[in-house]
Amino acid sequence: MQSIKNIIFDLGGIFLDIHYQLTKDAFINLGIENFDELFSQHHANNLFEDLETGKISEQTFYQLFRNEANVYLSDEQIKTAWNALLGRFPLERLDWLKQIKEKYNIYLFSNTNQIHYDAFMKIYETETGKNDFNNHFLKAYYSQNIGLRKPYPASFLYIINEQNLVPE
């Protein structure tokens, strides 16, 4: 058996704390009391997948969200509630990442969207004083940029083929 050379990490829950309940609570406070029925993580809704794969723009997302929720909220209200789930980048995890980087080729692959991306990059900069979280990795892959998301095998094959990795 060969030793491990490459590691593909996720972002949410690994390096960035995620609190889904905060987004749910924020939308309920804005009047969307059936948030779970419409938008839960386990409810199949193409709106989120389309946003996470870059098929729709931020502005289109806001409009479709309003239509789906059947309530008028401003773009800023939606953005603020949508980003409420984004937590901190615990510094001890970033220190651990630096140690791992010394021994392995590390990559990031995250299902995300441009709204969250912009917000968590600001969080990272505020917490660390540095402006590019992506520098921790040989390459960072975000679903909205590659048009593919987890858990679909094609998303992993995309990275494996682009980086000439051997999955084991």
Language-model segments: residues:
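Short beta-strand/turn micro-motifs composed of small residues
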Residues: S110
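N-terminal helical cap/lid subdomain that shapes the substrate entry/recognition surface
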Residues: Q2-D95, E102, N113-A119, Y142
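A structure-centric signal for secondary-structure junctions around beta-strands
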Residues: S3-I4, K103, F137, P167
